[in-house]
Amino acid sequence: MNFNDIDNQMYGNLEEDAELLAELAAIQEEEMGRVSRPAAPARGAPPAARGRPAPAAPANVPGLDPRLLAAALADNHGDGGDEELEMDEDLLNELNGLVGGGGGGGAAPTVPTRAAPRAPGPSGPPPSASAPNSQLGHLKQLHVYYMKAHKSAEQAGEGPKARRYKRAVDKLVELIRAVERGKTIDESEIPVAPPNFSSAAAEPLPPPAPTAQPAHHPPAPPIRQAAHAAESSPPPIPQRKSSAPAPTAAAPPATKEPTDPKKAAIYRILHHRRDLHKQNARAAIADKDKESAKESVEMAKAFDQAIAALNECSADEMDMNDVPPSPPPYRKPAPPQPQAPPTSAGPLGFIEELQQRQQRFQKMAEKAKTEGNERKMKMNMRLAGQFDEAIKEAKRGKLVNVGELPSLPDMGPLPPQTAPGQAAPKLHQRPPPQEVGPLAPSGVEGKSRNQGQLEFLLERQAQFKQAAIHAKSRGDVEAAKKYLVEMKGFDKMIQAAQAGLPVSIKATPIPPQAQTASTTLQPRIQSAAASSSTGVENRGEKLSLLEKTLIEQVRSAETNQMRFTRLGDVGKVRLFEGWGKVAKQDLLLVREVAKRGLQVPKFHYEMRQIPSADLFPDLADDVIELTIVSCRDVPLPSGYETHHANLFIKYTFPAVVNDLPQTGKTKLIAGTASPDFGESIMLNIGSGKSRNSKLQRTFKRGGLKFEVFQKGGFMRSDKLLGTCEWKLEKLEHSAEMEESLPLKDGRKAVGGLLSAKVRIRQPIGDAKAQHIAQKWLILDN
């Protein structure tokens, strides 16, 4: 049974049915009347010219009118969304190379035109068997391309393009169905492939068979072929404007999605955010916003480089917290507001403001003197004298601690202090303290976060290289190998940072140059010896005090440097590196002065806002680390000697989780009344929004309880030697506590001390106080 003849058996031969073809011609004429009404015929014209043509033989039926096809293909909707933008040529070239669109700055690209329909003729030589398959593949590729273009145009809000792409999609669906049924289609019906469309995967279309012009009228062609038959004078088909001119730069090569699940997730995130920047670039070009378009193009290029470098580094070295977030949809920037005309009187400088405030207090003192109020006069004169010292310090170029200067309620803030000879900057609102944490800004002015990370990694690598060379020169081959391995470990991170991919410095090793030896941080200057060697009174005490202060500053800088390294904050790591380096140089200078008997160097203190790193990122958020350090001089039972001691400690943590206290005990240490335990215990404190308030209430009611026991022997129970309780209220504002607690029997002290330490990830109370005002010693020479 021939399945191809089922339609003919059920409905007859539709392509040669005269009545059906006549009805089709009538419908066609009605549609043509809606699209463009022709001029009315002359009054004297015969009725046949005004009326509808009567049904005739199939040979006289014209089929689908080419004028209807021309009207359907015309894009005269009155929309101006596809007009050429007079944009910067460099910007368009960059966008072309990235998204595959936009024209170059040279000659205008050729506008593709649709080939004129050809009249069907007698069939030529049969095409090859691969021709339908290649044609079908080409149509499917075009269909996929126009579907994507239609979605992109709808998302970008481009109505004319979306409607044009929709018509192309519908036409391609119709052509694909026709080819799948084995029917022949005219190539002029295929929508024009855009210039940036790549069909390398498909086989080239075979050239159409040449058709000979018949000398006589052939029988009526089938319906689909009749749709393209040319009339005596068909109207010209309008040229379709290309949706995207030929690109001038090649698009970046596509990167395959990694097989690693972690990398695949990062790949999808980067790809999605890059596409959002591309959409913003297109919208900015359509709005003629050059700056926004250029910025979006640069961001999209950065994401392309990051995607390309994704296969060169491991997923553990990537910190997605550093990836720029998804951009908001593009909006046209508001026009700049007209600025107020500058006033003739500019803001006063720092020294002038100090002088005005001094005069203010002097006038108040004179007024009190005339009133006979001697106490008020002396007070105001003393306050005015403080401004005398501040003005002298400012004129010498030294920093002035404005926090110690008196002020009145109606006085505004002082302008920032500048060096002599420089113009005082305008008053501005003080910015809020920077956030401490992995998402904090880099803190390096004029540089992006990625540039700061790259410079930091290069410096760290150079430091390890110097350390390896120095160790080799000393003959320490093992240390040199270790430093060399650490130096090589920075290569992948540097490559990722150079490609624009964010990296995490949390796990980077600390170079030996950033760690000062413990022997260097031991006090060496003796006050009596330093004074007796020169005969200057109090010289030794001054040098000893300077040394101790500088040692504390070096320790503070190095501790904060390591903490902020674990937090991934490059800016604050560099800040404390600089402070620590200067403090170590000053420390060596003070020791050299004491050694040679030179004059005590001049120095001063300044108030610095120290970024607080009062948190421990190595701890989980739901635990407290308890460290029982040691006991000192524990009172033993009567009749016991020191060698009889066999001590351990029991601890009880208040009920926080499941309303049950957490208890435990340390190991036994025998033979001493001052045992060193050094045991760390992790106590669970739970999590949740109400956790902190519950902990605060618990720590106010009670704290940690310790009980020191002497281990019992045969037929003897353990004997309690002393107890102590530790209030943990300070954890509300501090992340670490360390204290030595006296042992008691009830309320009576029995002698002996117990040392313990507690750490928590971050304070359970006000954790936003991230800057601490601290006096910082600075040597003047």
Swiss-Prot record:
> What GO biological process terms does the UniProt entry carry, in alphabetical order?
regulation of transcription by RNA polymerase II
Q: PROSITE patterns in the record, alphabetically?
A: C2
Q: Which InterPro entries match?
A: C2_dom (IPR000008), C2_domain_sf (IPR035892), C2_Freud (IPR037772), CC2D1A/B (IPR039725), CC2D1A/B_DM14 (IPR006608)
Return the GO cellular component terms, semicolon-separated.
nucleus
Domain called C2: residue spans: 605-741
What SMART domains would the database entry show? C2, DM14
Q: Where is the composition biased (Pro residues)?
A: 119-129, 204-222, 324-341
Q: Give the Basic residues compositional bias ranges.
A: 269-280
Checking Pfam families in the record gives: C2, CC2D1A-B_DM14
Q: Region (Disordered): which ranges?
A: 32-63, 94-134, 187-296, 313-373, 403-447
Q: What is the protein's name according to its record?
A: Coiled-coil and C2 domain-containing protein 1-like
- The protein's organism comes out as Caenorhabditis elegans
**Organismal lineage:** Eukaryota, Metazoa, Ecdysozoa, Nematoda, Chromadorea
